[in-house]
Amino acid sequence: MEKQKTMRRRLFSYLLVLLLLGGGCAASHKSLDQRIFDVNRGTETTLAKVLPQLKKDRVILVGEHHTDENHHRMQLQVIRMLHEAGMKVAVGMEMFRRDSQPELDLWVAGKIDETAFEKIYDANWSFPWSLYSPILLYARDNRIPVIGLNVPSDITRQVARTGYQSLSEDQKGYLGNVACRVDKEYMDFIRQAFGGHGHGDMNFLYFCEAQMVWDTVMAVTALDYIAQHPDTVMVILAGTGHVRKQAIATQISNRATIPLTVFLPEVPGSIEKDLVDNRDADYIWMTP
């Protein structure tokens, strides 16, 4: 019975991949025709036309609303396009903690079956496996490294409640002793991206510190990986609040001069071509 359940789950995951990609060469062609708004030029373009630029990048950030299947389909399109163009690709994911890297490596090597890996996923992330399984199955089947970027949630919760200064030396050491300096510009960005949060200035400051720690650790982890793999481009998948240029991208640029590109999905009322500029993103995925 358990074997049958595993087979059904695997079949469902592969069917979902096919549905999201549309199948075969036609799917690849359709993906390249995806409408994109070029924020810098103020014009619409397609994924195919931006590919030459993406080939020059070391990091490509692709944002999401975690529960939106269309956003995950777009993320997979970018990964697949780069892989099929012959580039060495790694996928950095907010959805996994850094200490889950041994299990991620086993998954990509094909040494953990889907049932076992789904449990590892569930221990890291609270959203349904079906939302991310097409990306993770594609990575496994094509031996594309998956890199955990996230910080343990108990640390970010503690910072949000009582501030960065409340962390122990061991906790700070786990984070790589990253600095946490929140300025007015970053606080204004957080207000815009997350709608305020907190009750009172001190709580909001702590919330900003938690986001800063989160963004910084993900950026440093990505930089460490690409420094060790100079022929690889990393595609970072994270929520839109982390992918806006003021977040992970800024923390990367503060530490290294490397070419990178930021994609945000179109979200009516918050992420639209008339509501963002090149301080937020380079491209906006247009809603199909």
What is the role of each PLM region?
Residues 4-12:
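Bacterial N-terminal signal peptides that target proteins for export
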Residues 25-288:
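Compositional signal for N-terminal targeting/processing segments
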